[in-house]
Amino acid sequence: MEGLCLNSFTRVLLLLFVFLVFSHKWQRVNAVEPVLELVKGFEAKPDSSIDSFQPLLTDSNGNFSFGFLRVNGSRLSLAVTHPNLTDPLWVLDPTRSASWSHKTKLFFNGSLVIIDPSSRLEWSTHTNGDRLILRNDSNLQVVKTSTFVEWESFDFPGNTLVESQNFTSAMALVSPNGLYSMRLGSDFIGLYAKVSEESQQFYWKHSALQAKAKVKDGAGPILARINPNGYLGMYQTGSIPIDVEAFNSFQRPVNGLLILRLESDGNLRGYLWDGSHWALNYEAIRETCDLPNPCGPYSLCTPGSGCSCIDNRTVIGECTHAASSPADFCDKTTEFKVVRRDGVEVPFKELMDHKTTSSLGECEEMCVDNCKCFGAVYNNGSGFCYLVNYPIRTMLGVADPSKLGYFKVREGVGKKKSRVGLTVGMSLLAVIALVLMVAMVYVGFRNWRREKRVLEEDNGLSPGPYKNLGSDSFNSVEMSRR
């Protein structure tokens, strides 16, 4: 009897232990509240009731969160966010996303892994760590023991650089729309615009002044880092910067977080979080017309006047309907017109290649003979000829009539669409008219058949004109009455 009671008590303890273990694991996996670390065995799926961001992990100060970010309503990306910042500080590969559904699963097994069979997405840190943590500076890390970092998000920036984060020559900041990027050169920071699938255009450059330290050949590439004292520093070796790009908060004691973002208009802006709001702290490009494409394709940006179209005839924002892809102007199927205009200059000309010609005609001829050339801009004073070998974007409007532009404008998608639309519309009207005609003929034919059948049933008696009263059938009726 005592053995039976002991066995029953043992079974109860075992069941209680199993329940506690599995209930603890279930709470950890499906907890709504974010935790301070994720350990091996963690799993999570997106919650269908959440419409923006589902936090899974937070830093110890509660300023940053890591979790599922809902993108375009039905898509999902892994992201690190700040509660008072509209856009995330870090996003896992913005060119790829998973579906926001129960099929998507995130887990940590030493590697951070996300799988979505429906989108054929499978990503992993390929590590063998013990924990996933979020540092107080927003750095997401896979760590082994307490000190060894096997993977960190700071090595894979998106469009944001955070205070004290190293930005190396192997990295790039990319704007959310994918059109602009920031990279390091041998002794400078450069901003680039994607002007076609094959090429990029340099549009902003900040070279190191090398006042306190010099760039040394063979000493390795430079790196950039936001200093808490309010500047973006460039370094090569040691802690002495080869350049200091000052923010508004430069050498002012502030208690907050500094970030630098490459935004969708191509500008590089710095922000300061002071504990209550984000304040603009830096702008690389101060003038609107110095941005890479402020007015759109085939347009002019004139300082103090705003945007206009190169041909002076179309509505702003619709200066052309032409495709923004490269073209072969030597192909006979490529239709285009030529627009000439004075008071035009290429933007960021200091960063563009040029050739010297003796006349405008010679400059134009160089573009005419080049099958890939979209336009040429000529300075009659210096003789500089700038060839634009990509779809025309925003040009710079100037008051100097000696600066002349020659542009090839393709017969655009809009015109072709209008022709197609007109053809479709006319065809539709013709079909409707044909259907109505057939319907009218059919109805007329049915009425004629009906009347003919009635006449045959009545032996030819039918209401008709007065002159028919003299017919043979009518006379026979009268004779019978007599």
UniProtKB/Swiss-Prot annotation:
One of its GO terms (cellular component) is endosome. Keywords: Disulfide bond, Membrane, Signal, Transmembrane, Transmembrane helix. The lineage of its organism: Eukaryota, Viridiplantae, Streptophyta, Embryophyta, Tracheophyta. Pfam families: S_locus_glycop. It is found in: Membrane. One of its GO terms (biological process) is recognition of pollen. The keyword Membrane applies. It comes from the Eukaryota. Its main location: membrane. Disulfide bonds join C363-C385, C367-C373. It is a single-pass membrane protein. Residues 1-31 form the signal peptide. This is PAN domain-containing protein At5g03700.
